[in-house]
């Protein structure tokens, strides 16, 4: 290669390969709560495939397992522990209800 072309080549950086989030020995099952709970957000939502770093097949199996666990009441549908205080009615000023008069 010419010396001018070599200037633009980037050096290859070494990277550490990430371990898969689900080891090969783990079975994806609705009863395996320790595995399922890793793929649910704090609000109780199923995390996306990008966040989980799962394959398409694994994400489908996790989603089905979570939905089965919810139906069997092993998992809550929503986790609203934090948001309960947000929707409580606060002390507000009383409304003044007056008589409406029509101008003729």
UniProtKB/Swiss-Prot annotation:
Region ranges (Disordered): 84-104
Gene Ontology terms describing biological process: translation
MF terms (GO), sorted A to Z: rRNA binding; structural constituent of ribosome
Cell location: Plastid, Chloroplast
Pfam families: Ribosomal_S18 (PF01084)
The entry's keywords: Chloroplast, Plastid, Ribonucleoprotein, Ribosomal protein, RNA-binding, rRNA-binding
Gene3D superfamilies the UniProt entry points to: Ribosomal protein S18 (4.10.640.10)
Domain of life: Eukaryota
Entry GO CC: chloroplast; ribonucleoprotein complex; ribosome
Signal peptide: none
Matches recorded under NCBIfam families: S18 (TIGR00165)
Family, as annotated: Belongs to the bacterial ribosomal protein bS18 family.
Subunit structure: Part of the 30S ribosomal subunit.
Protein name: Small ribosomal subunit protein bS18c
Gene it is expressed from: rps18
